[in-house]
């Protein structure tokens, strides 16, 4: 063992932290040894010769100068010109080169599903061993264990051959029609190396997602228009964002590196100026340091690696691919130089940096208010009343209301945005604003656009203004300036005279009114004429996209914009009007969803205006709005950007100067002419300069990608407006290249030059077409946004600008540094580099700054990435109608941070921020930095930025990596969307792509696995969700690109319909709350406890200590009583045995109708009087005695449907003294499942005979039943309709303590248990119910529930006979046939009291939600209902109950009357809402506290709040306490524990328990270990708490404005705390009975005001324990049910420590995979749990018992036995 005394202090600190983590079980032994070795490695003996040299980061750009290179400096040895400014200028034209071939290794997968899944990390702190070994070895930014270095021999070998082969390779390049050439070759090589580095490492075995055969057979391509078969035949569509459209990967990522070796010795800083060998080492070390700075030192802050899901083991997968030659760019110098303005940061020395503690308390306990204590001696020297007053005054006040709504999950936010202390910091000087050249307006340029059109329309009326091509490439129409002027005047005149009807009003359009322009993308001529018609009239046009259908979602957002702008008139063409969606009834234009009602005005075939009409009379103010352009933000919201007339004309002038436009020039436009660059150049600036524009529709570009180049050749065009997509498409059309000449082209404007991947498109296009006359200075990338217009533009010709005209720049940047917002140069052969080109210079008359993208707009440093802001006279003015967003975007004053020295020299130094000037800047939404000479570098956009775990990633970078993964043609080229979603306080990366139609499931899984590895290795970020959709399933923009916002919306909504989904929450989610640690006391107690407890408290503190603590603090002990059972008036005349009661009623009131059975139509099927029941019971007793040879005490199985036969058979058994067992008959359609349960109950109950009716007897002996149960093995079966030969002699005499019947039931955990109910318990229960519910013979009670067990059996069979009331029986299956049967019965018979089940409530709510009007027409009135009790053995379903009340409130239902009962196996009726009981009280508890077995009361609507409703009122004679299920100690008031019950009608014990070998003897004879230790209780097996609360609530459950109970009563104790305290002490000291306690007893003086409410939380056996916390399945299931409308039912359970969620899909199988991400997101967000498996099944698969409870364990068994026939099973990684 090493001696650690000589180690530095911080190392010893970290070793101590590791020892603590190991002792607490946070990490494994293997992880401990690995981290410990890593800490001690720098201090072990080091081999010599391994010193690694370090260099400061060199400057971040290389600028090339083709014309005046010798004026800037001297040429160094590498041919790079070193300038006096420290920048390097490359003197040769960039070119492409190939690199070494790489080979892949074979990947083996092993399917060990349960083992690997169980090892998936549930904690955010450390990964399990199965996942720990998946860390990528190359380029592991953020992981200190995997530093990125090169093997020295490989490094030198490559560098020595690089220069000699460079020019030879460049000359050997061929331009062929090989599509691979235009993929991201350098990125592809980086991906291949990253994957190769991972292939030899062990993989966790994870099963591949499984699909049902029908889903597999379904073709992924569902659309008829399958227009993307190949990339050559059908060109991939445009972009991902409607604003910033893109289509293919950037080819700008530099070369990869060889497999790394670990760093042995800490690097030492040295100067970077030295020999060439030193320079090579510097490049290498720079790469190392750029990857080391983000490395944290311990597991909690390290993101677990992205893991590879294995494939099924049917056959091993081979990934040996043929070698592919890769090409890489070699445009950059191998050397980089220090920048003079600042010293480079020492980012290699981070070992001495002390880190904050790894353990962050991620959960803040919500403490209860506690009483202040007084002196122990003084407490007994004053009277009780005075002491009570003193304690009341000293009691802490309730928490302030705002505190209930504070965000208590801030720890999750902190964990999601960890600050890496070793991250690079910007170290440059603060930037200064960069000024564009002075705007010089050419002589003779028209003053306004209207003047320009009038001039050219008059003087050059035959000159062509616009030409459009048809889909065949032929010129169809040419619009001259004369025609444009005359048509615009016609439109202006028509708009000034047209009267539009707006409701009853007649309105005309006035100057300044806003109108919509709706024109298709192939009709620019009509659009231009309408545009200038609006300009002449002074109207404000808003161009919008053509709505494709009335249900399209993007037009909904546009409709909101139209409404906010007050637009009522839309201009369109006749052809467009015919294509608009029509109403099916009237044939008129349909009302589009979300749109205002528009008046459509056709701008064609208008009359000629009169001669006196003069469009020049309108003199609009320059500050007035000229037009509105829509833009979309990251979330998909559409906003209108208002452009003033001054800004419009100033921008046109600036473009005229920057682009050198002159009159008569010809421009070819491939862009969208309705917005942004296409609008500014082809519609506005072209008219200002009198130019000719040729428009190429998108449909033609898809068919003939080279058509724009052919038009340039044919018309000798001088300018062309394209996107990098069009360059790429033109390169693919090699067969058309021979006739192309681009010598006339002086400007090729690349509109999306701000996309970093445009660099490769420009370089490749230039290299191919330079031989066709294309000049290198003609390619002009530009950056733009709707808010700023043109941000920057590279000038054409580069010769006549004001300053540094010839400079163009590009540089290789570290993506890892960019993720921290810092610019650092990376080596060319780095896996994680990004190559950028400049987007030109600042526009004329504009001034530009870069400010921080987050927080206040502080000026950035020169080496810091921020948001580009511009001030000029040519920017937008505002977002229409959005003042708040306008101020934050269009009125930005950049701040300059300065240090304020204290006046006395001794104080602290403060940082103050001052505005740099009076000017307001406009945010462009582009992220970048400024280079020398005003060069603008853009590396992303604000909308495309994803901040994951504190680091920023560009969606474009992720796309480039994904598209470089083999096989290259797996997904369609431009059909990919990358975005982030906010889940659990952090952004998660989602990748959606369209797959090829012919790929198999296994191929998809392989490709997705490689993508996960590649993105994790290169970007150091995990993909949260990777989904593949069928071809043409991603939403498109009007120009065919990906509509990113709509794709994101559909993904979150669950309407994207993917074909394959892979979720990786285990590796991506690192900010889960810290697992709860169970201390040794809890673990020991859990082992010793005989019951299946849930670890309620830390038993290191004994139960006696807990009780004394409660007493000392004055807290009540949780104990409650029902009222005493009084003597009824006719008690002396009525015997107490139920058989005697029936015989007595038959004698005293023989004709009294006691039971009425209704059929499905509501008609009376049968009635039963007291005498009829008595006689039939005697007959059946005689039958059993005669034919069945039944003796008193024998067991008889009764298998009957709900009805009167069951009643008669039950009393027949009691008459004979036999013990009946009621059993639900098997379902005819589901015999295989239900018949074995029936037979099991018959066998377990030891029934000697079966009594039933003829249809069920035939079913038991049928051929279908014989496949499950042999008919010959049944006990003797008797038909109840058989007639005995002689009458029964007399009723058997039985004792009160003998068994009356056995109550069998299957629990939700799959346990079959039968309890013994004695005659004494039966009579006591009936007496208690009669007293609570005020039942007597004249009452009518409607029952709609299952009569086989629990309180349902008691209400159906016993209480009617005991109380003599009229019971109206409705079988639940009759309600399924007629959902309104139950409610109509209540109304028809004026029933005041009714009992039902949750199944009936749910059926009525779902089936009758749309039938309220028809029910009103049938005069159904529910005002008569006084109590509606839902019989249940679970926590009350608050949401379902509230929905039922709210729905039928329209029929007069009083919402207060609906309540829930509570019973269990040990006592069928503990709580029932009585006839005169107050309304059930509700409280809101904190779900997070509940997970930790605590009750913390909060307010309605508070974060993590859960509404819990009181389960009825305690029945008379019932006493309830709350005890700790582990320690059996008495809990305090409002503390969570197990509900124990003491009542005369408790069951007498279990007859038998089948399916569980646990000892349950103490369930009926439990004793407390503290307090009244001699009393016996029955353990219910349910967790809950007691709370003293008010007896009535003034508001119903639905009243959202009334405070909850928590706001109106004490948080800690009752009003009688002191007297209760004394009484408790006396009870403890005497060890006696505390039945006479004032706590909730009938003797309490405040009994009319206060009562003890029983709140049931859930069954102990159902508690799911994950991460040390306890979850109740119903809470998780409620969250899942809310996440998607197609989820019909849901159930959760655990499997190998993984959470499994089973959801029933009520929809098409194609929608199954929509549920997987939503279920995962919802459970993660609401419960901080990671779902391990999502199973999508058909409706009806989740088993539900007769009480409406889910049989989760049966479902689990079916899942493990593969019996569910799932539609889809997703295994989350």
UniProtKB/Swiss-Prot annotation:
Residues forming coiled coils: none
Residues modified to Phosphotyrosine: 60-61
Compositionally biased intervals (Acidic residues): 224-236
GO MF annotation, one: acetate-CoA ligase activity
Subcellular location as annotated: Cell membrane
Stretches with biased composition (Basic and acidic residues): 176-185, 241-253
Tissue specificity remark: Expressed in the developing nervous system. Ubiquitously expressed in the developing brain. Within the mushroom body, a higher level is detected in the core of lobes and peduncle in the late third instar larva. Detected in whole mushroom body neuron structures at 48 hours after puparium formation and during later stages.
Name by which UniProt lists this protein: Disco-interacting protein 2
